[in-house]
UniProtKB/Swiss-Prot annotation:
<keyword id="KW-0408">Iron</keyword>
<protein>
    <recommendedName>
        <fullName>Cytochrome P450-RR1</fullName>
        <ecNumber>1.14.-.-</ecNumber>
    </recommendedName>
</protein>
<keyword id="KW-0349">Heme</keyword>
<keyword id="KW-0560">Oxidoreductase</keyword>
<dbReference type="GO" id="GO:0046872">
    <property type="term" value="F:metal ion binding"/>
</dbReference>
<comment type="similarity">
    <text>Belongs to the cytochrome P450 family.</text>
</comment>
<keyword id="KW-0503">Monooxygenase</keyword>
<dbReference type="GO" id="GO:0004497">
    <property type="term" value="F:monooxygenase activity"/>
</dbReference>
<keyword id="KW-0479">Metal-binding</keyword>
<comment type="function">
    <text>P450-RRI catalyzes the O-dealkylation of 2-ethoxyphenol and 2-methoxyphenol to produce catechol. The cytochrome binds other ortho-substituted phenols, including 2-ethoxyphenol, 2-methylphenol and 2-chlorophenol.</text>
</comment>
């Protein structure tokens, strides 16, 4: 789940910037 940690953070940031 360590990999998901940074992935989740990046996804959250991307969603905040470009909410599809």
């Amino acid at each position: 789940t360590s990999t998901l940690s940074w992935l989740d953070e990046i996804t959250m940031e991307e969603l905040e910037r470009n909410p599809y």
